[in-house]
């Protein structure tokens, strides 16, 4: 029963409607139109209309395509005729460029990128590039191609229409209607990159060129006389093969400026007509006639030639390119192999002015180990610059040759070198006579030495170099005989000049001691002859030759530290040389200003105090009775270390000075075995004769007060009445010292070093007690754990904690017992490698 009248326009139910509140009512017209009968008929009518329209569209499209194909064929014929008549084939501004090729698929939704496959290598069919015929796009901002202007001719207008119509075609029909380009077309944009070759119109020329593909890898092509090696040539001319068009429209053959590097199978361009001789053959290059003389032993003689290059082009182009690049032009033809050295031509370029100087007889007498001036630390050359340039250009000087003569003009222009007090060594300095980079190869077998740097050599580690310096400064090496005919080299005096005498400074001696603290003393069996020494003469005049070395055996000659560099005998000859061992490590360190080297002993390492300019050999003159005695220094050993406890030392300075003095006492032990004693006149004066003996050849860096204090401490602690004592006193004091050290070592045992645990956490909480006291991680295997089984131990798995776990003493005993068992077990297993049977029995 309907209780409410529903109007046709009502879309919602009334409040009292039996329908729900969400019910929506529709009009009768809507209901009738949405009936299933009427909806199906309506859809059928729509489908019929769409099918009819599609059929009409397809018919129209097919007709249009047929018309377009006919028009395209006509326009192709007209295009060929017009292009054959035109001088410039690319007068059409609407011809497509590679930039247009990038946009052709974006602008045409019907076309897709479908390039054709390049032909095989052995085919001679002309290749049609897919990049040469698509619709032109002149304005890239507008996605639609613009129509050609009205000023164009009918043929060009038709060509533009054909191009536009082809864009709307599918890609299959478009590929069919593409006009085939002429074989002699030229493309301006491609001319900068790719050769315009008719049969190989593709960027990857190496894969399409028949000649290039055959010639790069086939060696039989080298034989020009063999007709079987001649491969089938393609349709292109050899004269046009290597022709590169540079955008010019002229048809004249141009000289090639780009060559393809066919050796590495790439399109790399080689500039400046450089022919790649690494190529296997010349067949890939057009216009090249190769004879057997250029290719190998097989055919006639002659040089290769190119048809596109004129006779005078090679020389003119090479000279022009060499002027631009700054490199000398190579010869036009390959010269025969040179019979002389290859570096003689480069020598002649630089040594035309300076004639090569021949070696003299004096150069052959040069000793190989003669000291060099430039090997020293303080050598500075005062020669003018032009001498170095002349000497560096000469290739005949090696490291050990002698400059036979210097030009007279250079001698006159260098008075500093002639008047210099530094002696001119006849051995060649490295940085002056270093062979230049263009020197001949017969000099290069010599050792190449680095140019000496004064800042690098001015260190305390260059011991031998400074020794050579003093040798060259004090007494120059006599390399020439008495009948020396070369008078152009000034021989310096054998003694130092007064200028060097004034530069005497004992601060250098202080530097000596500063550096010597870090060096071990390795000097023994040193002998001094100081009979004829006078301290006043030595201090006043350094021109006196240093004392000679005498009384030295051949065995001890190797480790000598000489007194003054080179000792001069009575006849003036060289009687000894400086030792180059560690004993004379820095004895010439104080001679930075050309000072003569004193005989310096490093007995007092206290270098914190400044040195006092006390007389060097004053104590030596007071103890003149020690004329022919030997002062022997031994290495620091156990004996000197055990005797450090001989005296009760209270200050740190005495502790630092004591081991050096103990060495002298050890020396006196060896020297006094024959019953000879020393004078002790100076004993109460503060300096014992033993200490004086040590300081007779060195400037003492401590005052006499320190030596008195040292002597008093030695007398009080030694138990004997004298500082050095006689033979019996020294022996008794030495024995007492040994007993004291032994007693102190037994009474005060060494504190055992604490070792960290060999295994960190996690430690075993349930393992055997042996692994727990050894701080090892036990694997908790119940019969016997792995650690105990490895070393043959008895595993302890007792439920209660053993006593050796809590008690330290018992634990130490248990650990020692375990270690002994472990060592025995390891000795049994590893007896062949490490231990012998005697060691096992001793264990």
From Swiss-Prot:
- Ranges for the region named Disordered are 1-20, 102-155, 164-183, 318-348, 401-470, 580-759
**Skewed-composition ranges (Basic residues):** 630-644
Q: Choose any GO biological process term that the UniProt entry carries and state it.
A: filamentous growth of a population of unicellular organisms in response to biotic stimulus
Q: Which residues bind DNA?
A: 768-795
- Which phenotype arises from disrupting this gene? Leads to attenuated virulence and defective hyphal extension in a mouse model of systemic candidiasis.
Question: What keyword terms does UniProt attach to this protein?
Answer: Cell adhesion, DNA-binding, Metal-binding, Nucleus, Transcription, Transcription regulation, Virulence, Zinc
Coarsely, its chief localization is nucleus
Composition skew (Basic and acidic residues), residue ranges: 659-683
Q: Where in the cell is it found?
A: Nucleus
Chain intervals with Pro residues compositional bias: 328-340
Q: Which domain of life is it from?
A: Eukaryota
Recall the GO molecular function terms of this protein's record: DNA binding; DNA-binding transcription activator activity; DNA-binding transcription factor activity; DNA-binding transcription factor activity, RNA polymerase II-specific; zinc ion binding
Q: What does this protein do?
A: Component of the RPD3C(L) histone deacetylase complex (HDAC) responsible for the deacetylation of lysine residues on the N-terminal part of the core histones (H2A, H2B, H3 and H4). Histone deacetylation gives a tag for epigenetic repression and plays an important role in transcriptional regulation, cell cycle progression and developmental events. UME6 controls the level and duration of gene expression in the filamentous growth program such as HGC1; and is specifically important for hyphal elongation and germ tube formation.
Q: How does it assemble?
A: Component of the RPD3C(L) complex.
Name of the protein in its database record = Transcriptional regulatory protein UME6
Originating species: Candida albicans (strain SC5314 / ATCC MYA-2876) (Yeast)
């Amino acid at each position: 029963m309907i209780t409410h009248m529903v109007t046709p326009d009502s879309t919602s139910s009334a409040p009292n409607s039996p329908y729900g509140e969400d019910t929506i009512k529709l009009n009768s017209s809507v209901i009738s139109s949405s009936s299933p009968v009427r909806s199906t008929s309506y859809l059928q009518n729509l489908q019929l209309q769409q099918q009819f329209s599609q059929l009409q569209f397809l018919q129209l499209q097919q007709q249009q395509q047929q018309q377009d194909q006919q028009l395209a064929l006509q326009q192709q014929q007209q295009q060929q005729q017009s292009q054959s008549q035109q001088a410039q084939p690319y007068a059409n501004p609407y011809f497509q460029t590679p930039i247009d090729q990038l946009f052709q698929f974006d602008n045409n939704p019907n076309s897709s990128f479908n390039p054709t496959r390049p032909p095989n290598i052995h085919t001679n069919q002309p290749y049609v590039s897919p990049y040469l015929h698509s619709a032109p796009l002149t304005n890239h901002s507008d996605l639609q191609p613009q129509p050609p202007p009205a000023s164009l001719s009918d043929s060009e207008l038709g060509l533009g229409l054909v191009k536009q119509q082809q864009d709307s075609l599918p890609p299959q029909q478009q590929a069919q209607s593409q006009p085939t380009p002429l074989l002699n077309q030229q493309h301006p944009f491609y001319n900068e990159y790719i050769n315009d070759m008719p049969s190989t119109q593709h960027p990857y020329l190496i894969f399409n060129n028949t000649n290039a593909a055959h010639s790069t890898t086939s060696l039989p092509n080298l034989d020009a006389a063999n007709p079987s090696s001649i491969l089938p040539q393609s349709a292109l001319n050899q004269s046009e093969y290597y022709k590169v068009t540079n955008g010019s429209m002229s048809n004249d053959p141009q000289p090639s400026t780009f060559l393809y590097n066919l050796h590495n199978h790439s399109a790399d361009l080689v500039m400046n007509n450089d022919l790649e001789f690494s190529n296997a053959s010349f067949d890939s290059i057009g216009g090249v006639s190769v004879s057997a003389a250029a290719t190998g032993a097989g055919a006639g003689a002659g040089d290769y030639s190119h048809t596109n290059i004129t006779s005078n082009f090679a020389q003119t182009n090479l000279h022009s390119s060499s002027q631009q690049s700054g490199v000398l032009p190579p010869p036009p033809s390959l010269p025969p192999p040179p019979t002389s050295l290859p570096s003689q031509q480069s020598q002649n370029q630089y040594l035309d002015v300076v004639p090569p100087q021949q070696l003299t007889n004096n150069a052959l007498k040069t000793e190989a180990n003669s000291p060099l001036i430039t090997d020293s630390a303080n050598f500075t050359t005062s020669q003018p610059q032009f001498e170095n340039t002349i000497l560096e250009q000469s290739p005949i000087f090696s490291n050990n040759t002698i400059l036979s003569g210097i030009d007279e003009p250079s001698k006159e222009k260098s008075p500093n070198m002639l008047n210099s007090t530094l002696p001119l060594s006849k051995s060649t300095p490295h940085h002056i006579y270093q062979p230049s980079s263009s020197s001949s190869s017969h000099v290069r077998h010599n050792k190449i030495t680095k140019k000496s740097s004064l800042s690098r050599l001015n260190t305390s580690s260059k011991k031998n170099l400074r020794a050579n310096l003093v040798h060259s400064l004090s007494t120059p090496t006599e390399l020439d005989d008495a009948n020396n005919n070369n008078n152009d080299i000034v021989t310096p005096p054998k003694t130092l000049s007064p200028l060097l005498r004034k530069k005497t400074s004992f601060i250098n001696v202080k530097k000596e001691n500063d550096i010597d603290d870090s060096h071990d003393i390795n000097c023994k069996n040193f002998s001094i002859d100081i009979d004829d020494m006078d301290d006043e003469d030595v201090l006043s005049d350094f021109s006196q030759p240093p004392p000679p070395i005498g009384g030295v055996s051949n065995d001890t000659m190797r480790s000598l530290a000489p007194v003054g560099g080179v000792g001069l005998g009575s006849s003036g000859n060289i009687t000894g040389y400086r030792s180059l061992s560690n004993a004379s490590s820095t004895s010439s360190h104080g001679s930075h200003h050309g000072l003569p080297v004193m005989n310096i002993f490093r007995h007092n390492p206290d270098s914190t105090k400044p040195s006092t300019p006390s007389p060097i050999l004053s104590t030596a003159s007071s103890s003149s009775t020690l004329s022919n005695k030997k002062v022997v220094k031994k290495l620091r050993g156990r004996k000197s270390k055990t005797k450090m406890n001989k005296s009760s030392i209270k200050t740190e300075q005495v502790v630092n000075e004591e081991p050096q003095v103990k060495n002298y006492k050890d020396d006196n032990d060896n020297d006094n075995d024959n019953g000879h004693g020393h004078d002790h006149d100076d004993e109460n004066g503060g300096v014992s004769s033993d200490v004086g003996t040590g300081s007779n050849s060195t400037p003492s860096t401590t005052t006499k007060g320190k030596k008195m204090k040292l002597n008093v401490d030695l007398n009080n602690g030694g138990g004997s009445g004298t500082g050095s004592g006689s033979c019996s006193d020294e022996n008794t004091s030495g024995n007492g010292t040994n007993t004291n050290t032994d007693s102190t070592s037994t009474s005060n045992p060494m504190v055992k070093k604490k070792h960290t645990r060999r295994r960190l956490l996690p430690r075993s909480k349930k393992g055997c007690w042996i692994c727990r006291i050894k701080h090892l991680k036990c694997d908790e295997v119940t019969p016997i754990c792995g650690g105990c089984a490895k070393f043959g131990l008895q595993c302890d798995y007792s439920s209660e904690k053993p006593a050796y776990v809590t008690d330290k003493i018992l634990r130490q005993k248990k650990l020692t017992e375990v270690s002994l068992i472990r060592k025995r077990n390891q000795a049994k297993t590893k007896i062949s490698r490490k231990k012998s049977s005697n060691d096992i029995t001793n264990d």
